[in-house]
């Protein structure tokens, strides 16, 4: 497992084309439009009174699943954006193995979601914001580098820090009024 953050040991550059904005980290290519879709999902969660986290799963340049948190509405602790997106993607592909898929999420995954990502064989995780909990960071790294499952996961963190922090701060301000 490799963990990349802008400004750390890698040159980061944005290339604007007429259709998309691409984000280069070494040889890894991230398309901004998918992260934008994850933020659209996060906004849906916000409007429903859910913690605003969104997830988008992409395979071969096509969106195959989108989801947002619905934990409160469903009264189910596992209904995180990443889990729901994985369920939708697996159903669409008729396979629990999501080989060749990438996931775009607005916040670094919790350990439960990281385990599901690893088990699903998702290759790249693009996270808008790193979870500030140091225990979470340690656990996530251990999950992604574990050889108990024959898959390798690359984690790209802190790609849209300000946008994600603002969304989360606004949500928690609104629920504490």
Language model: regions and residue ranges:
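A short, polar/charged loop-to-alpha-helix boundary motif
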Residues: 73-83
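Immediate flanking context of iron-sulfur cluster ligation sites
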Residues: 95-107
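Zinc-dependent deaminase
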Residues: 28-48, 96, 109-177
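Short hydrophobic alpha-helical segments enriched in small aliphatic residues
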Residues: 21-25
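Short beta-strand scaffold segments in enzyme catalytic cores
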Residues: 53-58
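Short Gly/Ser/Thr- and charged-rich N-terminal loops/segments
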Residues: 6-11, 16-19, 85
């Amino acid at each position: 497992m490799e963990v990349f953050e802008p400004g750390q040991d890698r040159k980061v550059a944005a290339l604007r084309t007429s259709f998309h904005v691409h984000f280069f980290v070494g040889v890894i290519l991230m398309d901004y439009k998918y992260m934008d879709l994850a933020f659209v999902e996060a906004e849906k969660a916000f409007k429903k009174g859910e913690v605003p986290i969104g997830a988008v799963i992409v395979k071969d340049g096509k969106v195959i699943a989108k989801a947002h948190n619905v934990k409160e509405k469903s009264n189910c602790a596992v209904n995180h954006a990443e889990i729901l997106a994985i369920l939708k993607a697996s159903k669409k592909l008729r396979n629990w193995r999501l080989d060749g898929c990438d996931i775009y999420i607005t916040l670094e995954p919790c350990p439960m979601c990281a385990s599901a990502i690893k088990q699903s064989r998702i290759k790249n995780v693009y996270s808008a914001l790193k979870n500030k909990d140091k225990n979470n960071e340690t656990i996530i790294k251990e999950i992604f580098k574990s050889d108990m499952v024959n898959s390798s996961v690359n984690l790209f963190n802190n790609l849209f820090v300000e946008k994600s922090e603002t969304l989360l701060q606004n949500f928690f301000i609104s629920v504490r009024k």
